[in-house]
Amino acid sequence: MASGSVAECLQQETTCPVCLQYFAEPMMLDCGHNICCACLARCWGTAETNVSCPQCRETFPQRHMRPNRHLANVTQLVKQLRTERPSGPGGEMGVCEKHREPLKLYCEEDQMPICVVCDRSREHRGHSVLPLEEAVEGFKEQIQNQLDHLKRVKDLKKRRRAQGEQARAELLSLTQMEREKIVWEFEQLYHSLKEHEYRLLARLEELDLAIYNSINGAITQFSCNISHLSSLIAQLEEKQQQPTRELLQDIGDTLSRAERIRIPEPWITPPDLQEKIHIFAQKCLFLTESLKQFTEKMQSDMEKIQELREAQLYSVDVTLDPDTAYPSLILSDNLRQVRYSYLQQDLPDNPERFNLFPCVLGSPCFIAGRHYWEVEVGDKAKWTIGVCEDSVCRKGGVTSAPQNGFWAVSLWYGKEYWALTSPMTALPLRTPLQRVGIFLDYDAGEVSFYNVTERCHTFTFSHATFCGPVRPYFSLSYSGGKSAAPLIICPMSGIDGFSGHVGNHGHSMETSP
């Protein structure tokens, strides 16, 4: 048997099958296997019965083991033999099994240690060979580089985890705050409704008492009259059956008493009670209608907020393309604001530029997916915003309509809002638009507009057919007064907690200014 094989056998015999290290206080079990004392303690825990061998899984009714001192001594000898091996790369690696020479070289092609005879052999001729020590140092350097890289990645992962934990805590704190606000608001609403309920029920109690007090006297009087009439009827019936002599006695008085009885007037409910009940019923009807309107408005507002929030999930940052701007339009340095000037700039008449109407396009181009952005129109009196195809005519007259590749809404002279359909559609808005949200669903062929301030839907172009890339579209003119203020594209990063390009499930093409 080769010496290397003997060494391997000795190492296997002195290695714990659980921790795969040299035995430390080996304990022999009834099945004959040896396990480190500490390993047995970890495997068995506090169990005293029905324990099993970690190696062969044989079960023992009682916890029984005994120290194997002989194996412990052999283990110490094997460890000493390994520490007394010859030093140096050749001694550490051993000798070449083929040539019985020390392994002092390393073949880079075959990635294995070799001896000097192997280096001269045909098998390794022409291979890149390094001294073993140099190869080991190189590998150690590579390992160190990988260790440094992995440690950096680990540190980054830890920071990301900490950021995630912080974000989770902050978001959960926000949801808890919202939860507490909802509970508080509904408690206030509940108490308010309960107070109204108590007041209405108390008013009903007052009406009940008024009804009793007002009608009970009349009912008591009727009861007395009925009792008197019953007595008189009984007397007349008795008189009617008497013999002639008795019947004629006091007949005049008897008939006179009957004749004095008058037919009662028709019953009339006290009008003041009817009026009070009518007023109360009107209050209840008003309350019912108010609660119904409140419920419907709350449901409608929740749906509006949800619809707008879903659109805002597809937020993109839009900027103005100066190569397309009409010369009278002045763009800001950050390409997010545009205002009208009577003085035209001296700009090149490139093919992309509008040369007759005060229009400018935005970037990027959209070729698929869903995209949302917002525009601050403020108090401007004349403007048009929306989307258009990138291929629209830039020179000469242009009519903003779907058949020409435009899908937009417009304000005329600060009074009339229009959707530029064909023919145009009037938009009877309850409140003026200050901030407009534009939502493009390219694949569905829809362009929607929202009143961001009121959180409500304004208009949607449906069944649009886009022939190529689509771009944000802006047009404005000067009409004096407040309308001289710029039209502003709102930065979408951080809008109400949303980040730009969150959920932008689509494709866009950047256009370089």
From Swiss-Prot:
Record domain B30.2/SPRY: where: 298-492
Principal EC category: transferase
Zn-finger (B box-type) residues: 96-127
GO molecular function, one term: zinc ion binding
Entry's induction text: By type I interferons and upon hepatitis C viral infection.
Compartments where located: Nucleus; Cytoplasm; Nucleus, PML body; Early endosome
Transferase is among the record's keywords: yes
Residue intervals passing through the bilayer: none
Function description: E3 ubiquitin-protein ligase that mediates ubiquitination of various substrates and thereby plays a role in diffent processes including proliferation, innate immunity, apoptosis, immune response or autophagy. Ubiquitinates PIK3C2B and inhibits its activity by mediating the formation of 'Lys-48'-linked polyubiquitin chains; the function inhibits CD4 T-cell activation. Acts as a regulator of retrograde transport: together with MAGEL2, mediates the formation of 'Lys-63'-linked polyubiquitin chains at 'Lys-220' of WASHC1, leading to promote endosomal F-actin assembly.
Family, per entry: Belongs to the TRIM/RBCC family.
Protein name as catalogued: Zinc finger protein RFP
